[in-house]
Amino acid sequence: MMELRVICIIRLVVACVLCLCIFIRSASSATEGFESIACCADSNYTDPKTNLNYTTDYRWYSDKSNCRQIPEILLSHRSNINFRLFDIDEGKRCYNLPTIKDQVYLIRGTFPFDSVNTSFYVSIGATELGEVTSSRLEDLEIEGVFRAPKDNIDFCLLKEDVNPFISQLELRPLPEEYLHDFSTNVLKLISRNNLCGIEDDIRFPVDQNDRIWKATSTPSYALPLSFNVSNVELNGKVTPPLQVLQTALTHPERLEFVHVGLETDDYEYSVLLYFLELNDTLKAGQRVFDIYLNSEIKKEGFDVLEGGSKYSYTVLNISANGSLNITLVKASGSKFGPLLNAYEILQARPWIDETDQTDLEVIQKMRKELLLQNQDNEALESWSGDPCMLFPWKGVACDGSNGSSVITKLDLSSSNLKGTIPSSVTEMTKLQILNLSHNHFDGYIPSFPPSSLLISVDLSYNDLTGQLPESIISLPHLNSLYFGCNQHMRDDDEAKLNSSLINTDYGRCNAKKPKFGQVFMIGAITSGSILITLAVVILFFCRYRHKSITLEGFGGKTYPMATNIIFSLPSKDDFFIKSVSVKPFTLEYIELATEKYKTLIGEGGFGSVYRGTLDDGQEVAVKVRSATSTQGTREFDNELNLLSAIQHENLVPLLGYCNEYDQQILVYPFMSNGSLLDRLYGEPAKRKILDWPTRLSIALGAARGLAYLHTFPGRSVIHRDVKSSNILLDHSMCAKVADFGFSKYAPQEGDSYVSLEVRGTAGYLDPEYYKTQQLSEKSDVFSFGVVLLEIVSGREPLNIKRPRVEWSLVEWAKPYIRASKVDEIVDPGIKGGYHAEALWRVVEVALQCLEPYSTYRPCMVDIVRELEDALIIENNASEYMKSIDSLGGSNRYSIVMDKRALPSTTSTAESTITTQNVSHPQPR
């Protein structure tokens, strides 16, 4: 009997142990792949609400001096009371998390309320996910869904104007279905809603994927439903938990959910709608409804019960900007109105490829080698995330190669580094320039493989020993090698170096490195003279030659046309940056000039603009930065510095500035005719019909101003905010490009420049620039193409008050242009007042400017030439019409000429002018 009892006890213990093991394994399996990081937490802990284990972030950032405590008002619902502040001058700081390649993940950053001025960006790898900005006293969460491209991923915080910060970072595996239509994209969460939810948030362990379902309040027009449901088969791996689905909204006729404040650029959105029929008495066909997204029907006759289950879900995609409207409308013949339990909205962002994997692994290996002897080195601490993309690492420069970036330059000079030169530097196969000078490196110089692409190596001013490796001297592409001021190195390589063509200091400490200008001065002068001479000859020939234009719309006939010569030889001043006189004004003087800011003439992103008069009687526009300005000191300094260095007839000159008592003021000449926007479709008091020749002249003037910026000596300038409101008109209607607060110097060859501050205005913004964040002059070209369409059509670039198909000027106009129906887009105010060839030149240029890929867009210099040709055609046609008028002919502005070619002045043939509509030539 005793033995039997013992056996029972043993079996009971074994059963308990097995149950415990199964429970532990089940719990472990449920959280497999979870990464939960509590930034600056005192220690690892278990969250009492979710029972998830959170670890501190000290394995990434051990410095506790940058830890801050979350404001007390926000502590009630938090387990981690701290956050990490990254006090950095520039760049990014990243958390590298382990992943499984090709697994889909959710990644979520939590950012505590800091201040109304919060503004910085976050990214997944090299793909910008969004901006952290908050004006409400609450936490902000940014969440993205992505497919892991490798076995780890970077989540980065990128500094803009303020130091970035973060309190929590969470990584969760997700089902594959989330990316079924966007396998190569990152999906940014816009909204995840538990309709009529009772609890604030539903997440893990109720939701095994730890999605956070936000409860929404019940709209006054809708009816809430709530039932305790069980034994429901929920098919689909993206299905919400049953606790979310047991509440719903319904209405006898329609449900509508409007999301405003979305980004104004076109993005694809994925909308996931979840339905669970809560009325057990309903049968299939009794609750049928149509589903619309932004008034576009996506599902017709949708019936939750049609498949025999009470549960159903659907995934819908749509392109939208600014807002997204989900509407469910009762179908004809249905007994009951629509129902919805929960939904998600995700924005699809293009995945930006990271640095070449080989280069990435090598430089990360090199960083680890350097850190062994340089634990607190400032340069190495700043090396975080991707070395090339979204703020390249200090000392690193990259170039594009086969769709990804490769490291071509490594400059760690004067970085206070010690220890041996990392051997991994020899594994950087695309490296061309290596500069490790002015450090404390010791030991031997590593050997480089003959396949190395190095063209310049500088190892001078270190503590290196031994002999210069033969492998370096014999590198096939090397043309400069400096290793002087290494007192322990042997200098017996002079003979070998003499036999090569390498520029070198021969290892001597007193040898001066030849400057590029000194070495190549004669060659540069000679080559430059030849190139300039050739350029002038070619330019003269191209501008003076007779152009043969094929007019496809007129039977394919060819008409020779003599093109006027419009060019000027560059003066010597054009090759040097001029110092323009910009006068500093006192605040007292500004207040006197504006009569205490009496006359307000405009408002902009920088602030208010007032009219004033200087002592000499010159009328001026005074731009005063407001306290709520979206632009700051950086934009003020940017415009001041730029306009102090440039001057051109078609750029608004800066007369002076004031920077006193926290006031930032810029002073310009007053432009009496306002802006191009005012004249085309501005306020009625400012609006005035511009005839076609005047519009063409304005377009040409603005193009010349932009071309001057793009060909600026030394380094071209990109405006970044080209639009009709930034093209001002003086008393003679001369166009002047204005507002240089966002302007930047163009990236030079070899730079790996990415601007997270994607600047511009909705309707004008280059989509390629926005998606890739790669800035170039062609971004201005795209915006100028929109301006040309404004000039032709008299319409604004975006107007959501028009029918949906006409919201975007570009998307509305393109089909008409491609169908050769340009008359359909021409401003009614100028119809009949233009020459067909001149108009087509402008329209064709606009279409080329609006090419989706910047490679296919023309440069501003080419645009200037095309517009010059168009103006010549228009002016010559006008002169011809004047001669007709003098003979008693018809008014030129009531007709359209039926030929784009100009009649010869010596021709005695009868005039071919007609008042009938003409067939326009096909766009080239």
UniProtKB/Swiss-Prot annotation:
Keywords: ATP-binding, Coiled coil, Kinase, Leucine-rich repeat, Membrane, Nodulation, Nucleotide-binding, Repeat, Serine/threonine-protein kinase, Signal, Transferase, Transmembrane, Transmembrane helix. It is found in: Membrane. The active site is at 721 (proton acceptor). It comes from the Eukaryota. May be phosphorylated. LRR repeats lie at residues 406-428, 430-452, 453-475, 477-498. Residues 361-382 form a coiled coil. One of its GO terms (molecular function) is protein serine kinase activity. ATP binds at residues 601-609, 623. One of its GO terms (cellular component) is membrane. The keyword Phosphoprotein does not apply. Its EC number is 2.7.11.1. It catalyses: L-seryl-[protein] + ATP = O-phospho-L-seryl-[protein] + ADP + H(+); L-threonyl-[protein] + ATP = O-phospho-L-threonyl-[protein] + ADP + H(+). The keyword Transport does not apply. Pfam families: LRR_1, LRRNT_2, Malectin_like, PK_Tyr_Ser-Thr. It is an enzyme of class 2 (transferase). One of its GO terms (biological process) is nodulation. PANTHER family: OS07G0107800 PROTEIN-RELATED (PTHR45631), PROTEIN KINASE DOMAIN-CONTAINING PROTEIN (PTHR45631:SF27). Involved in the perception of symbiotic fungi and bacteria and required for the calcium spiking. Part of the perception/transduction system leading to nodulation or mycorrhizal infection. Belongs to the protein kinase superfamily. Ser/Thr protein kinase family. This is Nodulation receptor kinase. It comes from Pisum sativum.
